[in-house]
Amino acid sequence: DGEAAPTAEALMRSRYTAFALRDEDYLFRTWHPRTRPAPPYWVEGTQWTGLRILGAEAGGPSDEEGTVTFVASWRDVATGETGQMRERSRFSRRAGRWVYEYGAND
């Protein structure tokens, strides 16, 4: 399973990398089962090109919940179109490990 992310922001960063690398197993393990959709977890043809963390509330090593607001940049590999998505993600601890619950477009 690997080492648990110490903060919600660390989990956010690792999940972005998992989306970019299409690591479905990692995304599955770090998604709260109550809110986890069926795979695949990405849009085919999307290449993730950057992540900028805008802020985090709580989500520290001693917290049980936290939020991370970020902007992720993407490119459509077929058309070359580029764009960004902004999200405020909610995280919580489950069995002592941070998991992603849900996100809202910010």
Task: Report the location of each language-model feature.
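Surface-exposed, charged secondary-structure patches
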Residues: 43-84
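Rieske [2Fe-2S] iron-sulfur-binding subdomain
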Residues: 32-36, 56-62, 95
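Short beta-strand edge/turn micro-motifs at domain boundaries
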Residues: 83-106
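Tryptophan-centered motif/residue detector
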Residues: 31, 48-50, 98
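Core segments of small alpha/beta cavity-forming domains
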Residues: 1-44
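Aromatic side chains
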Residues: 16-19, 26-28, 70, 91, ...
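Acidic-enriched, low-complexity/disordered segments with a strong bias for Aspartate over Glutamate
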Residues: 1, 23-25, 63, 76, ...
